[in-house]
């Protein structure tokens, strides 16, 4: 068992060292290799989080990838050949995911599984995630299940060009020891169709859509400001807005596009109006 202090799980410190609390839960979705984890890491960096002194952390990052189901021998054989669909909703242990998130929202310390992408198996080792003020939960299908989707106080969707996502996916899977031909076959057979059928339709549930992911620093900075408001005790305004039926939904435009219309009806210039050559 390991305490959260690196990788995609960042802990906030032992419960004995901090008061019991109910975290503000943020869902971060988007297609494969869209930059979800990078966006989360940038948010953590801008909030001044430190990988060494994890006891002082107020923000946790948790990946949906940790909740892949334990495969049968037949399924594992298919996975090793690139013939198993890891982008389908049924590939995830949604019951365990829901229970874990429920405990996190209740301010409890939880143990999350560790998944090995080389052997396609869940390891015996778990990671301890301590209570935090803000929890970022990222994954391709975190908005697919209504039961899980409704748990988020804020929903972000990272919207990245499909060609960019494919190139990132290839590089990532090659680094995981995968064969290039197998990667491309899996992408065209499973990944792309699953994105169009299961992931992309959930974009409509996002409160904030972030074009170009971490490259869109205007969007990232505004989101960080909202999180800072929460950390500073201004979380109530979000709950009040939700109770009054007001939507937080907004899309951060590309350079050269018209500025987004905010919930208040006012227009706000979020990026430069000139597109770089």
Swiss-Prot record:
<dbReference type="InterPro" id="IPR027417">
    <property type="entry name" value="P-loop_NTPase"/>
</dbReference>
<feature type="binding site">
    <location>
        <position position="120"/>
    </location>
    <ligand>
        <name>substrate</name>
    </ligand>
</feature>
<feature type="region of interest" description="Disordered">
    <location>
        <begin position="1"/>
        <end position="29"/>
    </location>
</feature>
<feature type="binding site">
    <location>
        <position position="186"/>
    </location>
    <ligand>
        <name>substrate</name>
    </ligand>
</feature>
<feature type="region of interest" description="Disordered">
    <location>
        <begin position="246"/>
        <end position="277"/>
    </location>
</feature>
<feature type="modified residue" description="Phosphothreonine">
    <location>
        <position position="251"/>
    </location>
</feature>
<feature type="binding site">
    <location>
        <position position="178"/>
    </location>
    <ligand>
        <name>substrate</name>
    </ligand>
</feature>
<dbReference type="GO" id="GO:0043771">
    <property type="term" value="F:cytidine kinase activity"/>
</dbReference>
<feature type="binding site">
    <location>
        <position position="87"/>
    </location>
    <ligand>
        <name>substrate</name>
    </ligand>
</feature>
<keyword id="KW-0547">Nucleotide-binding</keyword>
<keyword id="KW-0808">Transferase</keyword>
<dbReference type="GO" id="GO:0005524">
    <property type="term" value="F:ATP binding"/>
</dbReference>
<feature type="binding site">
    <location>
        <position position="169"/>
    </location>
    <ligand>
        <name>substrate</name>
    </ligand>
</feature>
<comment type="function">
    <text>Phosphorylates uridine and cytidine to uridine monophosphate and cytidine monophosphate. Does not phosphorylate deoxyribonucleosides or purine ribonucleosides. Can use ATP or GTP as a phosphate donor.</text>
</comment>
<dbReference type="GO" id="GO:0044206">
    <property type="term" value="P:UMP salvage"/>
</dbReference>
<dbReference type="Pfam" id="PF00485">
    <property type="entry name" value="PRK"/>
</dbReference>
<feature type="binding site">
    <location>
        <position position="115"/>
    </location>
    <ligand>
        <name>substrate</name>
    </ligand>
</feature>
<feature type="compositionally biased region" description="Gly residues">
    <location>
        <begin position="1"/>
        <end position="10"/>
    </location>
</feature>
<keyword id="KW-0597">Phosphoprotein</keyword>
<comment type="pathway">
    <text>Pyrimidine metabolism; CTP biosynthesis via salvage pathway; CTP from cytidine: step 1/3.</text>
</comment>
<feature type="compositionally biased region" description="Basic and acidic residues">
    <location>
        <begin position="268"/>
        <end position="277"/>
    </location>
</feature>
<dbReference type="GO" id="GO:0004849">
    <property type="term" value="F:uridine kinase activity"/>
</dbReference>
<protein>
    <recommendedName>
        <fullName>Uridine-cytidine kinase 1</fullName>
        <ecNumber>2.7.1.48</ecNumber>
    </recommendedName>
</protein>
<feature type="binding site">
    <location>
        <begin position="30"/>
        <end position="38"/>
    </location>
    <ligand>
        <name>ATP</name>
    </ligand>
</feature>
<feature type="binding site">
    <location>
        <position position="215"/>
    </location>
    <ligand>
        <name>ATP</name>
    </ligand>
</feature>
<comment type="pathway">
    <text>Pyrimidine metabolism; UMP biosynthesis via salvage pathway; UMP from uridine: step 1/1.</text>
</comment>
<keyword id="KW-0418">Kinase</keyword>
<dbReference type="InterPro" id="IPR006083">
    <property type="entry name" value="PRK/URK"/>
</dbReference>
<keyword id="KW-0067">ATP-binding</keyword>
<dbReference type="InterPro" id="IPR000764">
    <property type="entry name" value="Uridine_kinase-like"/>
</dbReference>
<comment type="similarity">
    <text>Belongs to the uridine kinase family.</text>
</comment>
<dbReference type="GO" id="GO:0005737">
    <property type="term" value="C:cytoplasm"/>
</dbReference>
<dbReference type="GO" id="GO:0044211">
    <property type="term" value="P:CTP salvage"/>
</dbReference>
């Amino acid at each position: 068992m390991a305490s959260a202090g690196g990788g995609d799980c960042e802990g906030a410190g032992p419960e004995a060292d901090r008061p019991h609390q109910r975290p503000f839960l943020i869902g971060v979705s988007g297609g494969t290799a869209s930059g979800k984890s990078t966006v989360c890491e940038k948010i953590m960096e801008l909030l001044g989080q430190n990988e060494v002194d994890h006891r002082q952390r107020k923000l946790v990052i948790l990946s949906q990838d940790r909740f892949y189901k334990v495969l049968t021998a037949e399924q594992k054989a298919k996975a090793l050949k690139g013939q198993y669909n890891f982008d389908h909703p049924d590939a995830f242990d949604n019951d365990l995911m829901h229970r874990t998130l429920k405990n996190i929202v209740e301010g409890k310390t939880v143990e999350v599984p560790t998944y090995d992408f080389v052997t396609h198996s869940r390891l015996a080792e778990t990671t301890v995630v301590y209570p935090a003020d803000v929890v970022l939960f990222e994954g391709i299908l975190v908005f697919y299940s209504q039961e899980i989707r409704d748990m988020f106080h804020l929903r972000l969707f990272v919207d990245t060009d499909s060609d960019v996502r494919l190139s990132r996916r290839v590089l990532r899977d090659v680094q995981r020891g995968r064969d290039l031909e197998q990667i491309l076959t899996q992408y065209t057979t499973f990944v792309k169709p699953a994105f169009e059928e299961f992931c992309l339709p959930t974009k409509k549930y996002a409160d904030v859509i972030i074009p170009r992911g971490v490259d869109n620093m205007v969007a990232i900075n505004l989101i960080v400001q909202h999180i800072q408001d929460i950390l500073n005790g201004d979380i109530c305004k979000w709950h009040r807005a939700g109770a009054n039926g007001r939507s937080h939904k907004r899309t951060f435009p590309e350079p050269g596009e018209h500025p987004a219309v905010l919930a208040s009806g006012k227009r706000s210039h979020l990026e430069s109006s000139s597109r770089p050559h």
